[in-house]
Regions:
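Conserved short alpha-helical segments that host acidic/polar catalytic motifs at enzyme active sites
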Residues: 1-322
Length: 322
């Protein structure tokens, strides 16, 4: 399975602190995928000589095919190479200036691994940029969503899922309804480049996901909570991560301006296919045994052959942004 990771930077933080963690997470995420890698840099901390964040630019029609594209509010870089070959020091200045960033390391389950259009982050629809770890039933998603999903450019289930989410932009409960329609394994992160002050992170069935904060108030997420412990050990405890496993069926809306914080939580019913838990053993790559056992003990997903509980999406916590 793929690896996802990201950060939202505290405004008063030394930019290199969170940037170093982000790059280190990318290297650790190679444990979960080496077929392709990429990252998106979101917003701007407005360095000296600049006023405010860049405005969103319309995504070019071929954005999903490009190895690098500047969308104004978001810059996307990706390649069909592992993270260690993709990342270069020339990206450090832009990363230090970004308010948020998220990355992806691909272990291909659907779609040609050697084709750039299938590498993430994916730029889709009217301006959604996202990454996905998992394997979902794309045909069922197209069939079950009444509003329909536009045609895909590539061959991945991730693109279909992100196109479905693009249709619910700006509607938190509507987004949870889309996630509840998903059948299969999923953990993902995305932004609406027209409203980059919020980053969305969600966990569906099975695929692990954790969020963490460090001693300077930076907020992170990653496929494995184990990675945060490794990095803290390497730093001699200086990073001081506080780590939380994200439960199945949870969408988090994270403020990417001001002080990073989870502004809203929305729950939905996660659904897996029969056998998903043993068909994809790589979902636990990079996760130590203690964390695997904890995730498994907390599992709450429904198997597709069983009846839905009928509760629908539920906004369980909300706070004003800004």
């Amino acid at each position: 399975m793929c690896g996802i990771f990201g950060m939202v930077r505290a405004q008063d933080s030394d930019p290199t602190w969170a940037s170093n963690v982000f790059v280190a997470l990318g290297h650790l995420a190679e444990e979960r995928g080496r077929d392709a890698a990429g990252f998106a840099l979101v917003g701007d901390r407005a360095p000296a000589g600049r006023a405010g964040s860049p405005r969103a630019a319309a995504a070019p029609d071929d954005a999903i095919h490009r190895g690098e594209v500047d969308l104004g509010a978001c810059r996307v870089v990706k390649d069909t190479r592992r993270w260690g070959l993709l990342w270069r020091r020339e990206y450090v200045r832009a990363l230090d200036a970004a308010a948020a960033a998220f990355g992806h390391t691909r272990h291909a389950s659907q779609g040609d691994p050697g084709t750039l259009v299938n590498a993430s982050p994916l730029v889709v629809g009217e301006g959604l940029v996202g990454v996905h770890n998992g394997d979902v039933d794309a045909d069922a998603l197209r069939r079950d969503l009444p509003a329909g999903i536009p045609p895909s450019s590539g061959g991945t289930d991730s693109e279909v899922l992100l196109l479905a989410l693009d249709g619910a932009r700006g509607d938190l409960l509507g987004t949870c309804d889309v996630l509840e329609t998903v059948i299969g394994l999923a953990a993902l992160a995305w932004i609406d480049q027209g409203a980059p002050d919020l980053v969305y992170v969600a966990r569906g069935a099975l695929c692990p996901l954790a969020v963490a904060t460090d001693v300077r108030g930076n907020l992170y997420w990653a496929s494995s909570p184990t990675w945060f412990r490794r990095l803290d050990e390497r730093s001699g405890g200086r990073l001081g991560f506080e780590v939380e496993r994200v439960p199945e069926g949870m969408l988090l809306a994270i403020a990417a301006s001001g002080s990073p914080a989870i502004r809203a939580r929305c729950s939905f019913e996660p659904v897996a296919r029969p056998g998903d838990d043993w068909r994809f053993p790589s979902i636990w790559n990079g996760v130590d045994r203690v964390d695997v056992e904890a995730f498994q003990a907390e599992a709450s997903h429904r198997t597709a052959r069983s009846s839905p509980v009928g509760r629908g999406a539920e906004l369980v916590q909300a706070a004003p942004v800004g």
